[in-house]
């Protein structure tokens, strides 16, 4: 029992700074929406539409680069720190290629937005302007992710927390300047949010670069040469390891976007209630997500130490701590569901329906916790391909179809509206949690030689 308590302390020491870093990142999006909304509804809608295209695209890139975390953790644990600089440099090359891809997609976002024939021309133009502004922050965002993955792989999660929080603080005045044309900046409205956020991503990268170059704990992993040529076999290895994670994130974000579209014909009350439950769940999601990142670090490090038993302890502890935290957040969601809904909206119909949906959101948190921490454990074992297949099946084969059948049709029961989609979420995430748990159990039953060989990929 003592070893699990000790491991829980290590996981929380890594996970708490990540929670704050993730909160800062999420809050930047909230700040953009709120500050644009203070101008008028069109500006806020433009930011919302633009973000719905920007977010899945950049998350795909970030997910691929997250593969660096278990790679660095394994090298750190196995005493091969001298190879970390090379992996980080190749990570920068990969981030450069991904940035070009992201910018190319976002530059042509006009075709995606204008394909929606019922969108107002002014809203479309402002959304495109926002995307064309924020896309120049993609390289800064992805370069920052490379250095953050290096730090997290070395069990240094506090730099990401501090720099993420500073980025949030910078974002507010820079937003204000570009939205309203203050301090000599042009008045851009919602487009100014894109300019501000892109600028903040570059500032965060430069701050993280300064930390990495100056920190005593990072000196021995600094590259000997400033510039090295791309090693395509190394870049390929990172990509093959990270692509399933990136696609899993992409599938998750696009699933919620599709569900929002499917709920929209049900009326304003249904859409607002669904959005309240989803937004609050997203805030609670930071806890298991952060523990999942901590689990990746601990499992990867222990496998580098060639201790499959300790890696197993890390995995079990992370899942147990995650379930306990999810139980607490679920109980909190149930008890205070009406007060939470009132924080978002004071319309009695919206609050009533949102309070009802929060009951489903509470159950959702339990299975979501297991599946997201399970994903982190599998990343630590470098078993990322299974994450892709599990996520695709759980979200798009089980979750979305069952949600649609329950929410919009009367084939099984009378159409349940938004509640049907939330039951679909629960079914999909529960299936994902079971499949993740089964996969972890299968890996841990294999011989130490097989597990360690996989971890050295």
Swiss-Prot record:
Keyword vocabulary terms for this entry: Antiport, Cell inner membrane, Cell membrane, Ion transport, Membrane, Sodium, Sodium transport, Transmembrane, Transmembrane helix, Transport
GO biological process, one term: xenobiotic transmembrane transport
Subcellular localization, as worded in the UniProt entry: Cell inner membrane
Membrane topology: Multi-pass membrane protein
One Gene Ontology cellular component annotation held by this UniProt entry: plasma membrane
Pfam families xref list: MatE (PF01554)
Record has Aminoacyl-tRNA synthetase as a keyword: no
Record flagged with keyword Transport: yes
Transmembrane segments: 11-31, 53-73, 93-113, 127-147, 160-180, 188-208, 243-263, 276-296, 316-336, 357-377, 387-407, 416-436
InterPro entries associated with the record: MATE_fam, MATE_MdtK, MdtK-like, Multidrug-R_MdtK
Coiled coil (residue ranges): none
Main location: membrane
GO molecular-function term, one example from the UniProt record: antiporter activity
Recorded family membership: Belongs to the multi antimicrobial extrusion (MATE) (TC 2.A.66.1) family. MdtK subfamily.
Listed HAMAP family: MdtK (MF_00400)
Role noted for this protein: Multidrug efflux pump that functions probably as a Na(+)/drug antiporter.
Full protein name: Multidrug resistance protein MdtK
Organism ancestry: Bacteria, Pseudomonadati, Pseudomonadota, Gammaproteobacteria, Enterobacterales
UniProt gene name: mdtK
